[in-house]
Amino acid sequence: MRIFFKSFSYLFFLILVVVLTYTLFAFYGYFGSLEPGGNSINSELPKKVLNSKIRSQLRHSNSSKQILFGDTHVHTTYSSDAFLWSLPMYNGRGPHPVSDACDYARFCSALDFWVISDHAEASTPHKWNNTIEQVQSCNKSTDPENPDMITFLGFEWTQIGDNREEHYGHKNVILKEIDSEYLPQSPIAAGGDSLNNFRDPNRVNETRINMMVQAYSDLGNRQRYYDFIAYNTDITSSPVCTGSADDNKDCLASADTPKELFTKLNALKTDSIVIPHGNTWGFYSLSLIHISEPTRRTI
């Protein structure tokens, strides 16, 4: 009997060591994988469909000008919010990389143009390089002289301020060129709270704990939670550029104010357009109005 209990104790101790070791490796992201950019369908919208779209407009208009329909605010699971909502605990459907966005814009929405605008604050060299490659690939699928759809490279400057004077709202940045020689080494993130929160070690550890709980509660889908840990680890391991080092591919450029953002955009080798996102999105808007006694002035 003593031998049995001794053997059982050794076995229990061995299992405990294995479980703890496994948990530790999972906690620090060793079992997670970074999402690739994907591979879009190497085909364009059928010419018959494209010509039908054009003829339908001309049939109802006296002008030879064509109205173009597009989307300037598109996220993939390279954005933290989209990744979070793709998790099994939210009944998400898993990864949706840039290639998926390309295919959806072309074959499902039949858009004339679209802009990939993932949150710059969550960007890393891995994501930015993959995004550029997929934007180029999406455009290569069509005739450059008569494209069925144009894909633009962009990013979202996700700024959050602590007070009215320093809250500027989000801005979607659209870059004209897609050739690497004209592009910045990284998108330009919004400095301050928005950027700091992504790289806060305490926040990352909290995320790791939450994901481990979800992984052990849903073992069949644990890999997706491990991938989210790897996603956050990749962000924290990618430094923010300091001083005049913005043109460094190994760090993330940032701008604290719209003035600084526009200054850095003007220094690029490509033209750009900036479209305000607005201030009406959840915690992104200021919580400075006391709504317990709303008045016309406060609202």
Task: List the model feature ranges, each with a label.
Residues 7-297:
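Extended, charged catalytic domains and RNA/DNA-binding interfaces, predominantly
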Residues 1-7:
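Positively charged n-region of N-terminal signal peptides that target proteins for export
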